């Protein structure tokens, strides 16, 4: 386990041991392909190189980077190697000041221009504009600017779901959903070592690296990660995506730490999901995107995941009219059938019709005695300057 650091003087922090620092080095120096659209070449980057390049250029542009952190499942992987969550997300957090729109735009331009450094040799860079780079390599751009949240996200595209996500945070109200995804590892000491030390790291000679749990209690969160336990704080603050993450934990054999409180947690998450995604098409897009990003190489787990999600929605949704709830359940069922069809387990199910018993709603003129499940509605992904945060 990471050892408690006396210099951190807080329950939320801990010093990484050599095994964890060594694993962190592997994550930061692993080559990750960033796939270009069309005829654009694949960029081969490491997290170490992209962090050093972006941080240096931000400082040159007058935006001070207070620290850089590894976040999400990659941080969890560093702390506990075989934790059941894998290491799909490569999330980096840059702590910066974003007082106005100008800083948001400057951060975006710096990241896009930094990508020029990673183009293969022989590629002419003279006529490649930031707009062109955005269309070629950016999977997602998000900007949030409210009283309690000021941050932006730039996601570099990887067709296998290992997007490199660069998050620039001024302030953010909540940085985690569950204790097991609350870890952040501060990279500055290791980055300093890369810049100035000529000696290779060893068990007896390596920088002190601090890990922090946004959950507030590092040892408790670490225990939850080791033992696959689901716990959180202030569940009413969890946004709509928390329901999808919770179901993801369940399909990976995590279990609730407190079985008495879990039903309340499930009701909170279901309610928030339908608040954030009230339209059936929004729900479909969110679910399909989540499956693509989190189960790209786990086709056999998709069906189990959707069935768990369906059970939770069926048992814990209290904020919807009956027909709205059934419409969402039907959507999840159709996605599950589609997954089975793609695995050649059953015939294609894009025109399955689901029949309902209409008795409780027969007096409702808007109620139909059957619901025809149309094929999934096609939609084209666009890449505007900024996407709203969901």
UniProtKB/Swiss-Prot annotation:
Single Gene Ontology BP annotation: negative regulation of cell differentiation
* Claim: Nucleotidyltransferase is one of the keywords in the record: yes
What is the role of the protein in this entry?
Answer: Catalyzes the transfer of one adenosine molecule from an ATP to an mRNA poly(A) tail bearing a 3'-OH terminal group and enhances mRNA stability and gene expression.
Protein localization: Nucleus; Cytoplasm; Cytoplasm, Cytoskeleton, Microtubule organizing center, Centrosome
Pull one GO CC term from this UniProt entry: nucleus
Any idea what this protein is called? Terminal nucleotidyltransferase 5C
Alphabetized PANTHER family for the sequence: PRION-LIKE- Q/N-RICH -DOMAIN-BEARING PROTEIN PROTEIN 44, TERMINAL NUCLEOTIDYLTRANSFERASE 5C
Source gene? TENT5C
């Amino acid at each position: 386990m990471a050892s408690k650091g006396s210099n951190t003087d807080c329950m939320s922090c801990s010093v990484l041991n050599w095994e964890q620092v060594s694993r962190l080095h592997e994550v930061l120096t692993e080559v990750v392909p960033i796939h270009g659209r069309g005829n654009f070449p694949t960029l081969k980057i490491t997290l170490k190189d992209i962090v050093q390049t972006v941080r240096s250029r931000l400082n040159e542009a007058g935006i001070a980077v207070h620290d850089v952190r590894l976040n999400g499942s990659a941080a969890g992987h560093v702390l506990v190697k075989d934790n059941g969550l894998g290491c799909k997300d490569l999330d980096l957090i840059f702590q910066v000041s974003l007082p106005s729109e100008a800083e948001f735009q400057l951060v975006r331009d710096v990241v896009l221009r930094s990508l020029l450094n990673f183009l293969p040799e022989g590629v002419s860079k003279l006529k490649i504009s930031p707009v062109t780079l955005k269309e070629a390599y950016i999977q997602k751009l998000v900007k949030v600017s409210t009283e309690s949240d000021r941050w932006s996200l730039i996601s570099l595209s990887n067709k296998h779901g290992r997007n490199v996500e660069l998050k620039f945070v001024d302030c953010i109200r909540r940085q985690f959903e569950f204790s097991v995804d609350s870890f952040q590892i501060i990279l500055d000491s290791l980055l300093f070592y890369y810049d100035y030390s000529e000696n290779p790291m060893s068990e007896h000679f390596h920088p002190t690296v601090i890990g922090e749990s946004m959950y507030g209690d590092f040892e408790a969160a670490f225990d939850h990660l080791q033992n696959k336990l689901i716990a959180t704080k202030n569940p009413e603050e969890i946004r709509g995506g928390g329901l999808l993450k919770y179901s993801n934990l369940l399909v990976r054999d995590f279990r609730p730490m407190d079985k008495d409180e879990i039903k309340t947690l499930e009701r909170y998450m279901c309610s928030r999901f339908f608040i954030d995604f009230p339209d059936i098409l929004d729900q479909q897009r969110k679910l399909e995107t989540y499956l693509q990003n989190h189960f790209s190489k786990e086709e056999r787990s998709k069906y189990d995941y959707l069935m768990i999600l369906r059970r939770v929605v069926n048992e814990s949704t209290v904020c919807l009219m009956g027909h709205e709830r059934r419409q969402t359940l039907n959507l999840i069922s159709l996605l599950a059938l589609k997954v089975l069809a793609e695995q050649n387990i059953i015939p294609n199910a894009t025109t399955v019709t689901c029949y309902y018993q209409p008795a409780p709603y027969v007096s409702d003129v808007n109620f139909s005695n059957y619901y025809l499940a149309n094929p999934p509605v096609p939609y084209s992904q666009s890449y505007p300057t900024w996407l709203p945060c969901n």
